[in-house]
Amino acid sequence: MFGPEGPTLRELAVQALSSVERGYDLLAPKFDRTPFRTPGSVLDAVAAALERTGPYDDGLDLCCGTGAGLDVLTRLCRGSVTGVDFSAGMLSVARARVPAAGPRVAWVRADARALPFTAAFDLVVSFGAFGHFLPRELPGLFTQVHSVLRPGGRFAFPVLAPPRPATPGYWMLLGFDAVMRVRNALWRPPFVMYYRAFRLGDVRRELERAGFRVELQPLPEFGRRRDGSPRARMVVARRPD
């Protein structure tokens, strides 16, 4: 699962017994060599889908981590690209990724639930971060994103279809979430990371309540399941003009 340059089991255990912020500070130097980093195939598929509605002027990578989404935004944005995350360690790694050419790039340490921006962006993207938010936090999070988008701006992120019940993937995610719930019941500070808490129906409903118009776009690069449904979709939430 992890390469020789990735974190050891001991390092992962220390991270898991820390807060989310401290845990990612510790993991940051080796994060890109773990399966937690968003795969390049997902980043490329999202960039290709968004190119059809671009270009954009200013983009924001929400919960940017080590900056994997930077390549997506620099392909799409002409003016500036901003990454925001509350882990100083992850931002430190991200700063080393800035290309020599392209739009202006800035990194901001802040909590996604209290973004320090006005309506300054035409595009907000996020990759693999929503498991760190409890369902009750989604309304506030989406309201924050709505507030930093200009009229007509888009909030886009990929969503993979959940594993079928009784498959190995289903039991793995169910077991992971169960372990995290036990850990958080017994240990402080909590480490919020739940793979099964981000349900597409609930997400769409909360986005619409926050004032977005929501569209689901299949990502054809990942094919379809036996029932014909897409294996991966991109959620595009647009702030009305």
Regions found by a protein language model. Name each.
Residues 212-223:
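Conserved S-adenosyl-L-methionine
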Residues 223-241:
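Core SAM-dependent methyltransferase catalytic element
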Residues 186-200:
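Acceptor-substrate binding/catalytic loop of class I
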Residues 1-54, 72, 156-180:
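Conserved class I S-adenosyl-L-methionine
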Residues 139-151:
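A short glycine-rich, Lys/Arg-flanked "PGG" loop and its adjoining helix->strand segment in the class I
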Residues 125:
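A conserved beta-strand element that flanks and buttresses the S-adenosyl-L-methionine
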Residues 60, 66-114:
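Class I SAM-dependent methyltransferase SAM/SAH-binding core
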